[in-house]
Amino acid sequence: MKRNSLSVENKIVQLSGAAKQPKVGFYSSLNQTHTHTVLLDWGSLPHHVVLQIFQYLPLLDRACASSVCRRWNEVFHISDLWRKFEFELNQSATSSFKSTHPDLIQQIIKKHFAHLQYVSFKVDSSAESAEAACDILSQLVNCSIQTLGLISTAKPSFMNVSESHFVSALTVVFINSKSLSSIKIEDTPVDDPSLKILVANNSDTLRLPKMSSCPHVSSDGILCVADRCQGLRELALNYYILTDELFLALSSETHVNLEHLRIDVVSENPGQIKFHAVKKHSWDALIKHSPRVNVVMHFFLYEEEFETFFKEETPVTHLYFGRSVSKVVLGRVGLNCPRLIELVVCANDLQPLDNELICIAEHCTNLTALGLSKCEVSCSAFIRFVRLCERRLTQLSVMEEVLIPDEDYSLDEIHTEVSKYLGRVWFPDVMPLW
């Protein structure tokens, strides 16, 4: 007997509905077998199954799938799928990302604004894109956003928007959300009055504010956020608005333990900013209150601007020097940064850092990561540094040209010695030829 084949095209399934019977002949067997033909109806899949499938699909694929049937279209508009959305806005045909289609933006405004909870805006370097982002922000009235991120992929384009337009749009979100927990508004014209509105409406929920490089925010504005938002766990800001009063506010008995503090120390022109010193008792109060806090400092200074830093014990854990840093400063780091976990030196004045590196290994006993580029260390000193740190040095990234051969070790020998102390194979990084 020739069986009917299953056809994918017409979505047919054959099911045998009879229990197995002893074979008593061809016709008897045929009579006791009931073949049912069922049409596979994808539209009959339960909502929760389709919803799970849709959650793994990119938006465009999800939109195409929603046209399969009415049920799938209903699932397409379920609120769970619209809680997180990134608006991408650009004006350039050569941009590295595609702009969100205007029709989709309008559909979200009409149907899904109330569902949005995790929202970000990614814009290119044009002021027009930032203006468009502000226009959308100003319409976020009937939604309760929990996280908000404003991301400029090139230069900070939000700084090219008029301050009044930006602040007005952002204030709409601050007033209507009531449950903001995380905001990333770095390189924007946000100001002190808008921060007061932020904490007035979201003080109980705000945990992770990132407000570095906001020139219109003063130390008073940051202090208002730290003082009123007792649940802050992370904070990112510029050094010039760091004050002793801020540290004391973050260290109050009612404030939760701070987990992450990122401080950007930036100068575009030498002498433009007079960097003040944070008092040791302020650092001590912070560490006593939050003993496990990661203090991350990014330095983009000229060498003559380091006079203020590292003269006293500083509880920094992650330290990045984006410009040239002198031997003297690195020597102070070794003596006064006992909590240091990670150190990255992008450049120095090409004086060998042998003594400074060994000092860091001896005094910074928590150090687990080191990155060196455009500086010089003798092979002997480098091997001694690695021997002092041994296997706790889990990340070691050093350009080959940093290592200077001496009478004890050549470049061909150094990887064997370093690998022995690290307990794993290690080679210096090499600049590719292309």
Curated annotation (Swiss-Prot):
Pathway: Protein modification; protein ubiquitination
Main location: cytoplasm
Gene Ontology terms, MF aspect: ubiquitin-protein transferase activity
GO biological process: entrainment of circadian clock by photoperiod; protein ubiquitination; rhythmic process
Signal peptide: none
Start-end of each LRR repeat: 158-187, 190-213, 214-239, 242-265, 322-347, 349-374, 375-400
Transmembrane domains' residue ranges: none
Cited SUPFAM superfamilies: F-box domain, RNI-like
Ranges for domain F-box: 39-85
Record-level GO cellular component terms: cytosol; nucleus; SCF ubiquitin ligase complex; ubiquitin ligase complex
Superkingdom as given in the UniProt entry: Eukaryota
The keyword Flavoprotein is assigned to this record: no
Keyword Membrane: no
Keywords: Biological rhythms, Cytoplasm, Leucine-rich repeat, Nucleus, Repeat, Ubl conjugation pathway
PROSITE patterns reported for this sequence: FBOX
Pfam family, one: F-box-like
Location of this chain's protein in the cell: Cytoplasm, Cytosol; Nucleus
Known function: Substrate-recognition component of the SCF(FBXL21) E3 ubiquitin ligase complex involved in circadian rhythm function. Plays a key role in the maintenance of both the speed and the robustness of the circadian clock oscillation. The SCF(FBXL21) complex mainly acts in the cytosol and mediates ubiquitination of CRY proteins (CRY1 and CRY2), leading to CRY proteins stabilization. The SCF(FBXL21) complex counteracts the activity of the SCF(FBXL3) complex and protects CRY proteins from degradation.
Self-association state and partner proteins as the record states: Interacts with CRY1 and CRY2. Part of the SCF (SKP1-CUL1-F-box) E3 ubiquitin-protein ligase complex SCF(FBXL21) composed of CUL1, SKP1, RBX1 and FBXL21.
PANTHER family: F-BOX/TPR REPEAT PROTEIN POF3 (PTHR16134), F-BOX_LRR-REPEAT PROTEIN 21-RELATED (PTHR16134:SF2)
Protein known as: Putative F-box/LRR-repeat protein 21
Organism of this sequence: Homo sapiens (Human)
